[in-house]
Amino acid sequence: MADWETRAVRSDGCRIAYDCRQGEGPEVVLLHGYGLDRTMWAPQLVALEGWTVLNLDIRGHGDSRPCADFSIPQAAEDLRAVLVKERCRAPVLVGLSMGGYVVQEYAWQFGGCAGYLVAGATPILLDCYSGWERAGLRASTPLLGVWPWRCLKSAMAMACSSTAVSYTHL
């Protein structure tokens, strides 16, 4: 069983932290959802035993700080910095929710991956929202800004979790 090593790369003023485990096959690169960090992938890491895995904290999440600004294109640049540092030739990118947006943006900007998997609540980055949906998203930004993070995280956990274990570890 290979050991995990925590590594980091600097990208546009932010330290991008990730765990790396050497193994076989193409690199599997995991990108978490909004408000989470790389620890969300713990159950999947068991199934990936023996594979080479890079498990990132996306900019502004977990140990990837400081983060003055965030954008999906910048997160894709951060991902590229990690892949260049690790000399990944044909990684398989796995993104959940916001991580799926980053995977799509990376594919759009850079391409060159063996495969992509975008899972869970990640529409393609095209003009897929109606005018009402776009207005609702714009209105939600200031509302979320006044909601205490602790309460927002708890509400997200309740909405997304189906077991006590998943709720308490979110």
What label would you give each PLM region?
Residues A2-R15:
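N-terminal cap/lid segment of alpha/beta-hydrolase-fold proteins
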Residues G100-G111:
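Short glycine-enriched nucleophile-adjacent loop
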Residues E27, T52, A90-V92, A114-G115:
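Structural signature of beta-strand start/N-cap positions in the alpha/beta core
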Residues W108, Y116-G145:
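Flexible "cap/lid" loop of the alpha/beta hydrolase fold
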Residues A139, W147-P148, L152-A155:
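Ligand-binding pocket scaffold of soluble enzyme catalytic domains
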Residues C14-R65:
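Conserved HGGG/HGGXW glycine-rich cap/lid loop of the alpha/beta-hydrolase fold
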Residues A42-P43, L54-V94, M98:
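Active-site loop/oxyanion-hole signature of alpha/beta-hydrolase fold enzymes
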Residues T168-H169:
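Conserved small/polar residues in nucleotide/adenosyl-binding loops
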